[in-house]
């Protein structure tokens, strides 16, 4: 087969091997950093690409989609969220876009719990303290954190990841509140979870974990006004998308002890951090590693490759995020 594909970063071998077996040409961006928009355009424009496999940090905007040319048959995003792609423009041009849902659900939910515990029990702060040689022996007031067992857990977004995160609370005897446009009967049955409005959730929760997609309605969903509703003992966890939180407002809330702590996997202007964030002891930060387990990343690579190959062969990708392209005449 003579398929011609561009991949914006070297993926785990499980996915790369699938692409190389199915394609005549698989070009990979050679640097271990996100390519710029112009670098992506140069890699695809006039190159007669059949497929593009990109990452969540790649800016696949209108200009990039237009540069793909008439030969492009599909775009595969190595992520569950696809706000980095101008899906509307791809749909106009009849280009199916796929993502990798489901496979990273538990890895991301697990990381949210890791951040919750790290923030609640001040683990990173205590680790630094110990490494610095400041630990002089057990002390009754040293690094006291918050109880998790028996606390109130607020889950904002009860889709795949949010629901999995909530269900993992079962062993901690927590009261669970959730906020979502749709009712989640499984959470209500398994956890006696209560669906509430966002303000109620923020006021009553000891831990608030965000699991919403980034759409116009969720940008700065958590702003200064919403942070002011939270308990001064509460912690905010974000493993969704950075712009869901007004990061400058979060810095002020943490600095002024309006909330007790935060655990962040994502950032508003990733990879840049809001001024002052890195200097705070009451925030735990990791480098967008929600799906970063060996097996999860391998499965994501296989899923993205399989959908791209299917589309190039003329089949419908399993995880198409713009199925409306199949209501029109599109490239085959």
Residue ranges and their predicted role:
Residues 44-47, 65, 69, 148, ...:
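A short, aliphatic-rich alpha-helical micro-motif
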Residues 97, 233-332:
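Rossmann-like dinucleotide-binding domain for NAD(H)/NADP(H)
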Residues 59, 81-84, 99, 103-104, ...:
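Residue-level detector of alpha-helix initiation sites
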Residues 29-32, 78-79, 95-106, 180, ...:
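Short beta->alpha connector loops at strand-helix junctions that form conserved
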Residues 1-98, 223, 329:
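An N-terminal-biased, well-structured beta-alpha scaffold segment characteristic
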Residues 21, 138-232:
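Rossmann-like dinucleotide/phosphate-binding beta-alpha-beta segment
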Residues 93, 101-152, 164-167, 317-323:
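Phosphate-binding beta-alpha-beta segment of Rossmann-like dinucleotide-binding domains, i.e.
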Residues 56-57, 80, 206, 212-214, ...:
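Short glycine-/small-residue-rich Rossmann-like dinucleotide-binding loops
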């Amino acid at each position: 087969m003579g398929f011609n594909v561009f991949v914006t970063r070297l993926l785990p071998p499980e996915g790369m091997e699938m692409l190389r077996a199915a394609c005549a040409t698989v070009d990979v961006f050679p640097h271990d950093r996100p390519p710029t928009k112009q670098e992506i355009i140069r890699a695809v424009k006039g190159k007669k690409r059949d497929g593009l496999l990109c990452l969540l940090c790649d800016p696949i905007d209108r200009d990039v989609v237009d540069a793909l040319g008439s030969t492009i048959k599909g775009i595969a995003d190595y992520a569950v969220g696809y706000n980095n792609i101008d899906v509307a423009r791809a749909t106009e041009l009849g280009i199916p876009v796929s993502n990798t849902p489901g496979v990273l659900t538990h890895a991301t939910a697990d990381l949210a719990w890791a951040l919750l515990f790290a923030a609640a029990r001040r683990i990173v702060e205590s680790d630094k303290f110990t490494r610095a040689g400041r630990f002089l022996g057990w002390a009754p007031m040293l690094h006291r954190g918050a109880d998790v067992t028996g606390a109130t857990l607020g889950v904002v977004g009860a889709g795949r990841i949010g629901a999995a995160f909530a269900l993992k609370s079962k062993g901690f005897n927590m009261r669970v509140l959730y906020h979502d446009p749709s009712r989640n009967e499984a959470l209500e049955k398994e956890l006696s979870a209560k669906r509430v409005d966002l303000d109620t959730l923020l006021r009553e929760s000891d831990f608030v974990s965000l699991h919403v997609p980034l759409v116009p309605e969720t940008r700065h969903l958590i702003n200064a006004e919403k942070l002011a509703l939270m308990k001064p003992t509460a912690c905010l966890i974000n493993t969704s998308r950075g712009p869901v939180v007004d990061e400058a407002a979060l810095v002020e809330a943490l600095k002024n002890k309006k909330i007790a702590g935060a655990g962040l996997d994502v950032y508003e202007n990733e990879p840049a951090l809001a001024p002052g964030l890195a200097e705070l002891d009451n925030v735990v930060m990791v480098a967008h590693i929600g799906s970063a387990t060996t097996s999860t990343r391998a499965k994501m690579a296989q899923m993205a490759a399989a959908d791209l190959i299917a589309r190039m062969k003329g089949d419908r990708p399993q995880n198409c995020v713009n199925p409306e392209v199949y209501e029109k005449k599109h490239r085959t």
